């Protein structure tokens, strides 16, 4: 009898545990990624590595460049030069997912810290006559706070011309990159998202994004400098191919996308 009771108790425990795992808790998906960004030395090392490589490439370019066209570097802002992990952590602790209202509160605080190595690299670029453009998909009404945050962290050339926010609902950065390219030779692009580099990756499904990465192999580390980001990105949107899915539906797509053996 005791043995049967123990077996029943174990079954109830396992069913309860499975239910907890299966329950949709979207904010908890970000726990590991956010902790990694905030606590791991490996994350910091990868950031330093990216900006060290960017500096080496820029040094090479400056030594060999003979064009009269002024040089420029284009960078993304979020998770490329500014660390927004406190916003993600707050969402997790409050059991929330990303929402524009809470994001606006965070942006207006202008308290994001600089990514490791970012300030040093961009000041090096500016000191050598290179123009630094910050192309971000933050909204126009977030521009003032964004500029304040960048200035407080010590980034150079932070003004209305160099900080280019999203206009309207268009998230594609290619028109803004082309605007810079009309006057400058863009020698480096820095970002955490493939859309920060080329229109090849904008709103493409997973297979096409990955195929285009392979086609662009020569640019990574030479013209494209990629920062790590394990908390969010357009790679997720690519999984559900632009469909408007509920949290539960996104869960199903994620589980179905895992490759085991």
Where are these regions (language model features)?
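Asp-based phosphoryl-transfer active-site loop
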Residues: 72-84
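Bacterial Sec-dependent N-terminal signal peptides
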Residues: 1-23
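Non-catalytic pre-domain segments flanking phosphatase-related domains
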Residues: 17-75, 240-261
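Short, acidic loop-to-helix structural element flanking the phosphoryl-transfer center
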Residues: 105-133, 140
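Sec-exported extracytoplasmic/periplasmic mature domains
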Residues: 59, 63, 87, 123-131, ...
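C-terminal cap/substrate-recognition subdomain and adjoining C-terminal extension
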Residues: 24, 41, 139, 143-261
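Metal-dependent phosphoesterase signature
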Residues: 88-114
């Amino acid at each position: 009898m005791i043995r049967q009771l123990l077996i029943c108790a174990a079954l109830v425990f396992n069913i309860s545990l499975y239910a907890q795992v299966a329950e949709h808790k979207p904010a908890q998906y970000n726990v590991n990624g956010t902790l990694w960004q905030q606590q791991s030395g490996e994350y910091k090392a990868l950031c330093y590595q990216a900006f060290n490589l960017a500096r080496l490439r820029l040094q090479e370019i400056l030594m060999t460049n003979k064009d009269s066209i002024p040089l420029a570097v284009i960078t993304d802002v979020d998770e490329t030069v500014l660390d927004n992990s406190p916003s993600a952590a707050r969402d997790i602790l409050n059991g929330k997912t990303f929402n524009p209202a809470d994001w606006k509160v965070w942006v207006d605080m202008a308290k994001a810290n600089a990514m490791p190595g970012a300030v040093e690299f961009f000041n090096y670029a500016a000191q050598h006559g290179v123009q630094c453009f910050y192309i971000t998909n933050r909204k126009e009404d977030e521009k003032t706070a964004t500029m304040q945050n960048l200035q407080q962290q010590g980034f150079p050339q932070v003004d209305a011309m160099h900080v280019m926010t999203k206009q309207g609902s268009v998230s594609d950065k290619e028109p803004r990159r082309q605007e810079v390219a009309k006057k400058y030779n863009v020698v480096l692009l820095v970002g955490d998202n493939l859309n920060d580099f080329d229109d090849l990756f904008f709103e493409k499904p997973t297979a096409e994004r990955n195929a285009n990465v392979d086609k662009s192999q020569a640019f990574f580390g030479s013209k494209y400098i990629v920062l790590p980001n394990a908390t969010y990105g357009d790679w997720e949107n690519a999984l559900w191919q632009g469909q408007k899915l509920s949290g539960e539906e996104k869960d199903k797509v994620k589980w179905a996308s895992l490759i085991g053996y």
